[in-house]
């Protein structure tokens, strides 16, 4: 059985250190289809990746990477909810075996945990990283090396966790990693609070989108995040664009993901996440064939004890009801 994300973080390699791992630890290649080519290689050959990287870097002068649209000049040292200026931090990186089965395969998902967050859920299970910003500053070159080392370790993909606020840095690092031989699919593993414009800039770069869709009710989103009242509307728009770009999840050898959308939803106490509405939205606005992970591992972490309605785990009946709703909505691919 795969480890939880918190267990993985305890055993993963600290930021920067993975770039120094000896190539001697290399496993068999993690690519699930020898004919597969990640989308970003075509964009790179066409010379468009460089232009996209430049456009994204310009956004940092008046930041609109997420729906908060703070318009802070991060290149001049200004910051907002995410707490970042022109640099970025990585907490840890390594093969992760606790993600969805199509990502894990035999050799794990090559997971890179970025520090800080633009959403700041009060129940965050990784609050030390997201809220407190634990991690180490790294360069674009080091991030590129980390991607390449994960590939050499046999990982099936490069899994970018909480990437929204560091998209320009990721694309810059990608430009460095490609000449080094990077050829794994990129996984954009996001909390779902992404601006539509940012996701559009990633068209042709990301192979696998894996967003959360946390809340259907603006009031719930506002209460249990850092006042992201527009979360339901923003997440819906971003996820529809992700689906337009990559479509349904496509699998290669061994059932390993190559391209497509994996959609996550965390069941919360008293149906505060609006699970019944979520599954109907997926079936209607995306497709009944969307790969959906209805997650039952909610536990009251960080500041959740201050909010009585979410200060407990969900019950078995609550989770079973969520699955019933998903099946009743016609969803066919439940993780």
Residue ranges of predicted features:
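A cross-domain feature marking catalytic cores of carbohydrate-active enzymes
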Residues: 162-164, 188-192, 213, 265-267, ...
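N-terminal cationic-hydrophobic initiation segments that often serve targeting/anchoring roles
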Residues: 151, 178, 203, 243, ...
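The −1 position to Zn-ligating cysteines in a subset of zinc-ribbon hairpins
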Residues: 62-65, 78-81, 116, 120
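Non-cysteine beta-strand/loop elements that form the S-adenosyl-L-methionine
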Residues: 206-217, 291-297
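Conserved non-cysteine loop/helix-boundary elements of the Radical SAM core domain that shape
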Residues: 129-142, 162-172, 177, 220-245, ...
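Auxiliary Fe-S-binding modules of radical SAM enzymes
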Residues: 2-5, 9-76, 247-335
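Conserved Radical SAM active-site core
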Residues: 83-204, 208, 218-219
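Short, structured loop/turn "capping" segments at alpha-beta junctions
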Residues: 184, 217-220, 231, 246-254, ...
């Amino acid at each position: 059985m795969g480890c939880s994300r918190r267990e993985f973080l305890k055993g993963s390699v600290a930021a920067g250190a993975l770039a120094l791992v000896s190539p001697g630890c290399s496993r068999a290649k993690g690519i699930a289809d020898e004919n597969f080519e990640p989308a970003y290689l075509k964009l790179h050959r066409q010379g468009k990746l460089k232009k996209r990287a430049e456009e994204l870097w310009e956004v940092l002068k008046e930041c609109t990477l997420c729906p908060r649209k703070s318009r802070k000049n991060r290149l001049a040292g200004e910051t907002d909810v995410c707490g970042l200026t022109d640099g970025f931090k990585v907490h840890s990186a390594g093969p992760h075996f606790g993600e969805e089965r199509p990502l894990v395969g035999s050799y794990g998902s090559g997971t890179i945990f970025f520090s800080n967050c633009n959403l700041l859920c009060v129940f965050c299970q990784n609050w030390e990283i997201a809220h407190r910003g634990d991690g180490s500053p790294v360069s674009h070159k080091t991030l590129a090396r980390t991607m390449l080392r994960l590939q050499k370790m046999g990982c099936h993909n490069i899994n970018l966790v909480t990437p929204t606020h560091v998209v320009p840095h990721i694309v810059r690092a990608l430009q460095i990693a490609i000449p080094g031989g990077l050829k794994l699919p990129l996984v954009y593993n996001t909390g779902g609070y992404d601006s539509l414009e940012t996701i559009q800039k990633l068209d042709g770069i990301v192979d696998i989108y894996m967003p959360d869709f946390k809340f259907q009710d603006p009031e719930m989103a506002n209460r249990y995040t850092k006042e992201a009242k527009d979360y339901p509307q923003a997440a819906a728009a971003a996820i529809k664009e992700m689906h337009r770009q990559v479509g349904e999840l496509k699998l290669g050898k061994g059932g390993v993901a190559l391209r497509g959308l994996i959609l996550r939803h965390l069941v919360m106490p008293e149906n505060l996440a609006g699970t019944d509405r979520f599954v109907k939205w997926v079936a209607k606005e995306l497709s009944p064939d969307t790969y959906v992970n209805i997650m039952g591992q909610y536990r009251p972490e960080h500041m959740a004890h201050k909010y009585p309605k979410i200060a407990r785990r969900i019950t078995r009946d609550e989770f079973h009801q969520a699955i019933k709703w998903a099946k009743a909505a016609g969803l066919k691919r439940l993780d």
